[in-house]
Amino acid sequence: MARTDADDPTGLLRGAVGLAPTWDGFVYIASYQRGRIVQMSPQGAFSVLAGQGATAPGNAELPLLGPSGIAVDRNGALYVADASAFAIRKLNHRTADMAPDGAMTATQPPALVRTRPFPWPFAPQYGSHEVVGVMGEVRGDYEGESRDHLHAGLDISKPMGTTVLAVVPETVRDPLPNSRDLGGLNETLRIDQMTYVHMRVGRTLDDQPLDEARFQLIRNAEGHVVRVRVRRGTRSQVGDRIGTINRMAHVHLELGPPRGKVNALVLPFPGLSDHVAPRIDEVHLLDAQGRRLDRKLGEHLLVPALGGPLDIVAEAWDQMDGNAARRRLGLYKAGFQILKADGTPVRGFERPRITLEFDRMPLAPDAAKIVYAPASGDAVHSDQRTRMLYVVSNWARHGRTDRVGWNPADLPAGNYIIRILAADRMGNVAMSGRDLPITIR
């Protein structure tokens, strides 16, 4: 019905996993893929009650990451199980034209982030180690597409063969917690809230078991390991040996379930410090066809007032204390501000507009192409040097993404400054290279 019904042309019901009928003929549906609660009237018409696309004031901002169940109580209140956010939501669907009674605040990360200090996945677990990748960075696919996906975790560098240690006491809950690409670069183990990638699960580089009670190595007739079995219910404690790093020379650590990944930098790792401000290499504008604006009037970039929405692009990167000089990390948040020629903000831009924030992993399959402009890519997964060109006029926050753009027609003709906000997770902000003088006419 979601794909063919004329009343549902945008596929509102795609990924429908929960349904609740009411006494007066309405039906409420939880759309897991869309992150929405959909209302179907007795006449069969669809509308979005809550989540992205809702028209009721306040309801569009409700942070539904992965609604998986829904129920209506005897008083008409609607309860939503948001599996990806570890939360139960409540709203009154009878007053959907106003903010719901149970106004939903931003979801909280898993409780384990309160563990202080939080151990690293290598020895010494309470020492310090180099972070070489953060959430939200652009990644390619090894096959020519440089903006294939966004990086979902925290990369921590160590040589191939280093033993990976569990960072929290957890119990395996998934019946298939480890990936099937045995010996591959992306071999993975997910215990519960923590996922470990780029390691040989449960064994050394020469396929010797690390812990036979937890990891059962299945061998063929020639004695080669063909499968590693990890039983559901297996318990791991902090410091337990769970694998060894493969030739990727780092472990990729993810926090949260597949559709609810939280930025692992919320974990209070000991010895992790960052006093290095991000760097902005360049700021430029792209038109609707992806062409770069390059005409100038003196020192100002000439911007056609009626040329339509533009992409504001900032090439930027970051480092942490102790990073190698060649290291290029991604930003935690970015945005922009429009200033008058005298440096005062125009109306609506009294503060920088934060448009990109990697607190949670974006869910859209095209998120990398929304966040990053062409020419972005990384040196490992793409045939180029690492470059991150952020489209700060688009939207990517709290797991949601959208193509937005900036329309110069909203301003009177004249001289302005586009000022970029580029910040890391520790609050350091780029101060140089952030301004682009423009003339709108």
Per-segment meaning from a language model:
Residues 98-195, 202-207, 229-232, 237-241, ...:
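Surface-exposed, glycine-biased beta-strand/turn segments
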Residues 1-15, 44-68, 98-101:
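Gly/Pro-rich loop segments of beta-rich domains
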Residues 32, 83, 93, 201-202, ...:
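Short loop/turn segments immediately following the C-termini of beta-strands
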Residues 40-45, 92-95:
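Short loop/turn segments that connect beta-strands within beta-propeller blades
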Residues 15, 33, 66, 84, ...:
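Beta-rich catalytic cores
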Residues 21-24, 72-75:
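Residue-level detector of Asp-centered blade-edge/turn motifs that repeat once per structural unit
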Residues 231, 273, 288-441:
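Long, low-complexity serine/threonine/glycine- and acidic-rich segments characteristic of extracellular
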Residues 26-29, 77-80:
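Conserved beta-propeller blade signature
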